[in-house]
Amino acid sequence: MPSTPPKAKWTPMSVADALGLRALVLLKDRQFCILSGVLLLAMIPLQWYMNYCSVYLDEVKFTYLSATYNLGTAAELGFMLLLPLMFKKMSFKSIMLIGLGALVFRYACFSAAAISGIRAFDLGAILIHGLIFGIVIVGVQLHAAELAPPELRNQAQGYVMTLSAGVGNLLSVALFGFLVLPLFKVSDKLHDWTVPYLISFGLAVLAMILFAVLYKAPKKLDNK
């Protein structure tokens, strides 16, 4: 974990500090902008899983739901333990491509399950969650803190969380909750999930391609 020294003692905490907004100065770097854009794009399908997966699994009568989520939690713990080793042995770009590839795999599985009705695809999509979360959110936090100057490291991590859990979540709810799902509602309690999952798959593929083509690891950033 990178060193993230706190603000000076007795310095008042502001809203900008809490949301990591002081790290916006880092956006002057083109590669940091690209990373932010890819993260935001990836958050739309990732937060879609967080918000609506339980609704989907309930509608399709997925059995052993609690046990499956417990397996997903165990897998997440395993992937999180592997993350520091990955950072030691691999470049950030390679690690991020693995995470985005896992996001693509998830929505390929969900799309296949929605089309075929084979619930084993849903199981695979759930178990991969730890790898996606560990890399695409936690991994980007660590990388952003490594790039930032010491006085902005905690701000950089806060910025990543605001972008992912805040802005990304709002965009996901706006797209799927207010636009896509209502269009594919087949009854009061049922939806046709095929197109929403194909849209998520397409967004994940786009995020992966953009990152692979555009991102080059920047040198250490400063706030000047």
Regions found by a protein language model. Give the residues of each.
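Juxtamembrane intracellular "pre-TM" segments in multi-pass secondary transporters
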Residues: P2-S36
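A membrane-interface helix-boundary motif in multi-pass transporters
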Residues: F178-L206
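Multi-pass alpha-helical transporter architecture, strongest
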Residues: M1-P2, L198-K224
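Helix-to-loop junctions at the C-terminal end of transmembrane segments
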Residues: F79-F92, V180-L181
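A late C-terminal transmembrane helix in Major Facilitator Superfamily
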Residues: E151-F184
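Intracellular juxtamembrane helix-capping segments at the cytosolic ends
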Residues: I135-P149
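C-terminal ends and interior cores of transmembrane alpha-helices
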Residues: A102-S116
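Helix-loop boundary and gating motifs at the non-cytosolic
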Residues: Q31-V60, Y64-N70
